[in-house]
Amino acid sequence: MGIMCSGDVSERMNKTIELLKEQFLSIHSGRVNSGQFEKVMVDCEGASVPLVSLASIRVLNANTIVVTPYDSALLSQIDRALRNVPNIGTPGNDGECIKIVMPQLTEARRHEYVKQARVKAEEARVSARNIRRKARASLDAMGLAKDEIVRREKELDKLTKDVISVVDDLLRHKESELLRL
């Protein structure tokens, strides 16, 4: 049956939305978010280990996050990894935990982040359209009756429109979050 299993197409469209949500979490909006640190990898004895498996990450207030290692011997490696994360404040190591005070965003920086969000949203839209295009191509290759092809293409178009609508809603929400002072 190929790519045209409606569940497969729907699943791929949902993955596009989930990826966009993850990407939006990594765009700093003026408030700290523990999601910004989920992808941070720590060099630990020659292996890259996710920060979330080595330390607790706690939001202290709107601008401060506290990273407390489960093993205090890993404090310096975690500190080093956090210093390599772009767009966060300088980590402050007090010997037990690491506090990161996120800098306030300037108006220019907020607009730069809005542009990044728009680029990510457009990439998600393009991805949804590419999934639709591939599904249509597999429909044509299936040799179905013309009316069945038309019916499935309408379903594809509706699914694609719905996904793009969700992408647009996520973008609007992220833009308002970024531009709110």
Curated annotation (Swiss-Prot):
Subcellular location: Cytoplasm
Any one cellular-component term (Gene Ontology): cytoplasm
Main location: cytoplasm
Keywords: Cytoplasm, Protein biosynthesis
Molecular function GO labels: ribosomal large subunit binding
Function: Responsible for the release of ribosomes from messenger RNA at the termination of protein biosynthesis. May increase the efficiency of translation by recycling ribosomes from one round of translation to another.
UniProt-recorded name of the protein: Ribosome-recycling factor
